[in-house]
Each structure stands twice: as C-alpha cells, then as structure tokens.
Amino acid sequence: MSRHEDRQKLALEFGATDNVTERGEEGAARIKELTGGLGAHSVVEAVGTQESMMQAIRSTRAGGHVGFVGVLHDVEIPGREFFYSHVHLHGGPAPVRRFLPELIDLIWNRKIDPGKVFDLTLPLEQVAEGYRAMDERRAIKTLLRP
C-alpha cells in the first residue's frame, strides 16, 4: 500500500501483485475486493498511526495475522471491534540482531540486493538531511557514507 510511485515500482519489483493507493476504510475495502471479500492472510503494519493500524486490522481476514514493528504513536484499538475481527495481533521492536547474520550472508552471496531501497546517498555529516528526505518522501531510504 503506497501512494508514492517510486515505492509502488519497488514493491512490484519485489513481488507485489497489486498496489493499493486508498487509505482508511477505502483501503481496507480495496484489499477485501482484491481477495474475493476475505481480506489478506497477513499484514505488516510499519507506520504506527491510529489510521494505519486500524486499516491493517480491517484489511486482514478472520484468522489472519497483523504484525507490527516499531513504535506505535498513541494507537488505541477498540476492544469490541478487535475481538470480533478474529485477527491475531503480534508486534514489538524488530529483532534486527536475530536476523542480521543470515541477512549479511544473503547479501554477501548476492541472493538479495538491499541496495534497491536506497535511492539517496549522502555523506554522514548530512544525516539530518537524509532523515528529512525520507520524512518528506523525497527518498525511500538514505545511504550514508563516511
């Protein structure tokens, strides 16, 4: 799900079958439409806002899973709606160190190319500009060089 063309292209390159640009109720309805009325088996929520979390839950089929990573920003999940959604919710900080050895191995053996997400390269002393570019959606991810 993205409204940004560069992210949409990258998602398709990584194997996405569809791009959904709608948000909120419209976004959840579009996911249901694409899945024959059922909803997604699994949803990753990586934004951390009220709207994005509720859209994730509402886009997931009964018995499906929502995984969230990162810090939630004042998200309140209505108990009754969540209970009757029959959705499993899992989350917490991303355990980077757990996966890092395997990921490094995949990178070194050229089985994955993480460079595709880096569309802006800056010197380390411009780290603030890198974060600003990502926040303003001028960059997907910023690669900082010493």
Question: What are these model-predicted stretches?
Answer:
Residues M1-H4, L72, P95:
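Residues in the short beta-alpha loop(s) of Rossmann-like NAD(P)-binding domains
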Residues M1-Q55:
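Adenosine-nucleotide cofactor-binding segment
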Residues V20, H41-A46, V69-V71, G92, ...:
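Glycine- and other small-residue-rich loops at beta-strand/loop junctions that grip anionic moieties
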Residues S42, G64-H65, H88:
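Short glycine-centered segments of the SAM/dcSAM-binding site in methyltransferase folds
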Residues M54-R58, R97-P146:
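C-terminal hydrophobic helical "lid"/dimerization subdomain
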Residues T60-A62:
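Helix-to-beta-strand junctions that scaffold the AdoMet/dcAdoMet cofactor pocket
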Residues G70-H86, R98-D105:
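Rossmann-fold NAD(P)-binding glycine/threonine-rich loop
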